[in-house]
């Protein structure tokens, strides 16, 4: 048995591969890389080949081991499921087979309909669409002595010798032919230490390699331009780079060939494909990173469907400058130095925090820089502690206007922290910062579950000012109540992100440092947690009981986060679980049910699938 893993985050530790990615990916795509891992890949285009899987914020790449070329294989927006399969790979030797992790990625792809494949030499045109369940008949076949499951489908031109001749006869100076040897016994050693594997999914432990002939078989030319935008943008052909093959009627679209640029969408059909990754290591966290990146992508893609949110965080059309990491680093350093100036007032700090938030939303590298040193995290938490749950400035206890300014600043700080936590689970510096001073993290938890104190309306003794002051008080009271609601929603989002930190610790990401049981034990010992949980249940009831009104993208993401918090309370805290069951059983019976969710949650949101699954789990725990 190997020694226990020390860092907990072996996401990017191969210097040779890192240099290769830096050279072959655009700067913004390289900065978006989250993790990579050596594995054995099985799909329709890969036959037990030893490669690196490279995960970014939007794409999954494959490259050789050692790296020679890189190609995109799956976009996260097309992913349907990511499962850990509990099986024993027969092609691996005994020691490696026992410690291997089998990861199955099911994704939707789009191909030309069968009647459109008659043109000689035309390959399938692939383009990402959102998933719809395909009712394909699976049949069993034998290949190299192994049992496979595949979609029952006639032989297509994609399998013909003509395709191989086309690929080999169109060399590019950047192209590298991909070897596709069949491997009977493969072995990978030195992959790290032993840890318990995450709970395997039993969705289809029988299925081994890839199914479906709809999987793309692109050439190995290095085509690394990342599709710009998220699902809120139109899925137009212009999103994917194309080049002419020399024939005026043939275009390469990404890595696929289309017989005519005016091909109608009516000739396309969606199918499910599978990508299988076999990781020979018990310490690898690539499965958790894949799940986390997919979830983060769906949250971000849903939020960007909100016009107001997108207008704040999406770059203006026509104003995009070339991406330069050096400029982002310089910008971050400047913001940080201005925030740390002595005698900074709240009015000076607020615009700097807002600028940092917008910059971090647009550039992941700022999130890395934020966690690289711990001082900015401690600074922001200490600022929150100055004003929450009550202000240290005694004047704010009587001054409603001042309290409004303080709450606005606190909301901005918490929103910034939400962004800094999101998508940074692969950063070892984040874990080190949070573990160095757990007292700061627990202080933050208390702040998040506590309702902010607001000043009471002061009596007015001047009779001539009574009418005017009453209107002013009503205005400030309404504004404060609105801010309290916004604060609660923002605190919910940050509590969700912190719960993920502890949950990932349970699953192997720094498990020696964090555990969900510690966090829930601490929370249930804090008196404000009961009021906080009650407010979440009431908000869920209010949101699902509104008649004939669809949830906005931001409301949909908030609902998902609320369900995740409720699930954590029900699973990991006996005290909170009993409180929810004893006090809100009727709400779950009459208001929080599947028909209400289906009426309010649009199917077009990427987060809908995850929310529905989480909703089922919460209902089952309440029963």
Swiss-Prot record:
Low complexity: bias regions: 193-210
UniProt lists compositionally biased (Polar residues) regions at 167-177
Q: What is this protein called?
A: Uncharacterized protein C12orf56 homolog
Comp. bias intervals (Basic and acidic residues): 157-166
Which Pfam family, giving just one, matches this sequence? DUF4551
InterPro entries attached here?
DUF4551
Q: Write down the PANTHER family for this protein, in alphabetical order.
A: RGD1561648
Where is region (Disordered) located? 157-237
From what organism does this protein derive? Macaca fascicularis (Crab-eating macaque)
């Amino acid at each position: 048995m190997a020694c226990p893993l020390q860092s907990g985050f072996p996401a990017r530790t191969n210097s040779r591969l890192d240099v290769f990615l830096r050279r072959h990916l655009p700067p913004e795509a390289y900065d978006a890389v989250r993790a990579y891992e050596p594995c054995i890949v099985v799909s329709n285009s890969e036959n037990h080949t030893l490669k690196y899987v490279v995960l970014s914020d939007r794409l999954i790449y494959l490259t050789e081991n050692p790296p020679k070329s890189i190609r995109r294989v799956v976009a996260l927006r097309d992913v349907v499921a990511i499962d850990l399969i509990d099986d024993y790979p027969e092609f691996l030797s005994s020691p490696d087979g026992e410690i291997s992790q089998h990861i199955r990625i099911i994704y939707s792809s789009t191909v030309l309909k069968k009647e459109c494949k008659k043109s000689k030499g035309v390959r399938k045109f692939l383009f990402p669409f959102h998933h719809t369940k395909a009712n394909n008949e699976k049949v069993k076949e034998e290949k190299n002595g192994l049992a496979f499951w595949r979609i029952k489908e006639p032989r297509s031109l994609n399998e013909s010798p003509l395709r191989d001749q086309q690929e080999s006869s169109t060399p590019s100076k950047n192209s590298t032919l991909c070897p596709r040897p069949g491997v009977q016994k493969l072995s990978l050693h030195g992959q790290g230490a032993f840890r318990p594997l995450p709970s395997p999914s039993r969705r289809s432990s029988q299925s081994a390699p890839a199914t479906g002939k709809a999987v793309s078989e692109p050439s190995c030319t290095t085509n690394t331009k990342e599709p710009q935008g998220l699902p809120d943008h139109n899925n137009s052909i212009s999103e994917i780079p194309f080049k002419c093959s020399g024939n005026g009627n043939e275009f390469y679209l990404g890595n696929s060939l289309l017989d005519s640029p005016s091909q109608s969408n009516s000739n396309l059909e969606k199918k499910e494909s599978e990508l299988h990754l076999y990781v020979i290591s018990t310490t690898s966290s690539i499965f958790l990173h894949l799940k986390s990146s997919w979830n983060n992508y769906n949250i971000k893609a849903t939020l960007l469907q909100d016009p107001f949110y997108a207008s704040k965080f999406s770059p203006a059309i026509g104003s995009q400058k070339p991406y330069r990491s050096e400029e982002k680093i310089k910008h971050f350093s400047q913001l940080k130095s201005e925030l740390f100036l002595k005698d900074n007032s709240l009015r000076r700090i607020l615009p700097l925090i807002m600028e940092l938030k917008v910059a971090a939303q647009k550039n992941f590298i700022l999130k890395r820089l934020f966690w690289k040193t711990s001082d900015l995290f401690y600074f922001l938490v200490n600022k929150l502690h100055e004003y929450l749950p009550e202000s240290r400035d005694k004047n704010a206890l009587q001054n409603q206007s001042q309290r409004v300014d303080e709450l606005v600043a606190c909301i901005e700080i918490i929103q910034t922290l939400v962004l800094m936590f999101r998508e940074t689970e692969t950063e070892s510096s984040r874990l080190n910062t949070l573990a160095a001073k757990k007292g700061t993290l627990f202080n933050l938890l208390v702040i998040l579950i506590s309702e902010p104190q607001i000043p009471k309306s002061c009596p007015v003794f001047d009779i001539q000012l009574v009418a005017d002051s009453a209107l002013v008080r009503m205005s400030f009271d309404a504004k404060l109540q609105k801010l309290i609601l916004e604060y609660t929603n923002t605190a919910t989002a940050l509590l969700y992100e912190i719960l993920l930190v502890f949950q990932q610790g349970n699953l192997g990401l720094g498990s020696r440092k964090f555990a969900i049981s510690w966090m829930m034990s601490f929370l249930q010992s804090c008196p404000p947690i009961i009021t906080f949980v009650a407010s979440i249940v009431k908000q869920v009831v209010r949101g699902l009981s509104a008649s004939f009104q669809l949830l906005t993208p931001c409301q949909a993401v908030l609902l998902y986060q609320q369900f995740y918090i409720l699930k954590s309370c029900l699973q990991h805290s006996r005290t909170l679980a009993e409180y929810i069951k004893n006090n809100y059983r009727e709400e779950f019976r009459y208001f929080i049910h599947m028909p209400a969710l289906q009426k309010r949650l649009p199917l077009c949101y990427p987060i809908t699938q995850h929310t529905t699954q989480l909703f089922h789990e919460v209902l089952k725990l309440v029963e």
